[in-house]
Amino acid sequence: MFQLTRSVTWRALERLKQETFDDRISDYFAADPQRFEKMSLRVGGLFLDYSKHHVSDAVLAKLIELADHSALVQRRAQMFSGDIINVTEDRPVLHTALRHLGDEPVYADGKDVMPEIQSTREQIKRFSEAVRSGEWKGYSGERIKDVVNIGIGGSDLGPNMACRALLKYRHPELNFHFVSNVDGTHIQKVLQRLDPATTLFIVSTKTFSTQETLLNAKTARRWFLDNAGEDADVGAHFIAASTNRKAAMEFGIREENVFEFWAWVGGRYSMWSSIGLPIALSIGFDGFMELLEGAHEMDRHFIEAPFAENMPVLMALIGIWYINFIGAETHAIVPYDQALHQLPSFLQQLDMESNGKSVDIFDQPVNYKTGPIVWGQTGSNGQHAFFQLLHQGTRYVPIDFIASLKPEPGFEDHHFALLTNMLAQANAFMEGSQDGSQLDPYSCPGNRPSSTLLLDELTPRNLGALIALYEHKVFVQGVIWNINSFDQWGVQLGKRIAGEISERIDTNVGDFDASTQGLLSLVREYFPASTPDAKASDNNKKSRGKTS
């Protein structure tokens, strides 16, 4: 069986790590005045500078060789053609089909999926235009003014991030709210400022069985019925994005208002599907299509560009260099753009849920590091929060700086200050400051690596390309590590145990460890046979004891 760490290229990279460990990035520039030109590239409205990395020409060449010798070409072709590459769930992975814009068919299990995708796009178009124009009315005959998306994970993070990033394109008479946390204070704070007559709820759940989402959806429906309409009015104020049409209809949602998506769409890759309905409602269907077009453009680049000029591949390989050879444990995402303040959270799920794996596709434990801890926040704020550790701490943290170049009219001075701060930080991380007359506490060692990603402007098209770029970067790393980037069994384990605890909280908890039992006893003091599950269990016991 193939052993990644025993390959000739891997061992060559281990030797290069020893040979280049003491190199300074700034010396690479001194030795090669063309380094910036060589190590930067543009795809559409995105520009990547990867020259400020602790990567010599020899290292980069070996990293590309690593990709050449991997299964990347084969696995990439399999993904785009609808072959089953999510092997643990026996599914194809076809989020790229959701933004496919050509006339060519795309197959999954021998069936062309494009007709259904195009039909759902048309459904999104009709519905979003009806709501935005005011044609869609609530039970009182008033137009919709507030849209509440109820979801969690991929059903929340993607549309939430995109709607906030593209806020300047938002319909002026529509407000958007996102409820994800099962903590009741989250939905309470949203509902208390809304009018049920003018509020539309989108219940976004792949299976229509996600505990957190269903509990929030039931709370929203109860609030709606208590404050306004009757059961028959639910259909005018609740719609769903789900694969489970039957369950959505049982909830009270009209069949024509269940927006389909498919089992081959992973949650963290679902914003291109009907899960992206809030985006279409916010920026309009044309804007939503521009988002898809930008992602599709990045898809074509990923397929067609040679590895040495392939933006997602290069970002993935540089990440592998730091994780597997330099020993970096984390990766910071720092957008110098307030509109992108949700991007670090979105990319955190995309990367950590995809590549947080320790078993390979051959069911063998890996003997090398896989996905990094991804974190970050907006740059200007981050400078006054965690940059101190990045400059002078003992952690080695590669950074992605992200910014858009075009300023908002009237705020040019703000945007110029923002961009100059970003450029200064990238330079400072690389150069450092070491003055022999100063004491060590005043010195910054520098030699800290970073990429800089510049968007011409933060538009739907460029945002789509940016997200697709990171999707493909994560995929490439998963292929090289021989792991399945498209399942999430760790997430499923927690869900299962939560269900077991909920079912047993009022009965037998002896199967759990002593700590869990002790904590449950404290919980019981506040929920003495009063939890919804306990009540249901009690009612079931009573009904079983009755005779008819």
Curated annotation (Swiss-Prot):
Q: What's a GO cellular component annotated to this UniProt protein? A: cytosol
- Catalytic reaction list: alpha-D-glucose 6-phosphate = beta-D-fructose 6-phosphate
Gene Ontology MF terms? carbohydrate derivative binding; glucose-6-phosphate isomerase activity; monosaccharide binding
- Give the intrachain disulfide bonds: none
Q: Which CDD domains match?
A: SIS_PGI_1 (cd05015), SIS_PGI_2 (cd05016)
Q: Which GO terms describe its biological process?
A: gluconeogenesis; glucose 6-phosphate metabolic process; glycolytic process
Associated pathway: Carbohydrate biosynthesis; gluconeogenesis; Carbohydrate degradation; glycolysis; D-glyceraldehyde 3-phosphate and glycerone phosphate from D-glucose: step 2/4
Q: Which family does it belong to?
A: Belongs to the GPI family.
Protein name, please?
A: Glucose-6-phosphate isomerase 1
Q: Which organism is it from?
A: Chromohalobacter salexigens (strain ATCC BAA-138 / DSM 3043 / CIP 106854 / NCIMB 13768 / 1H11)
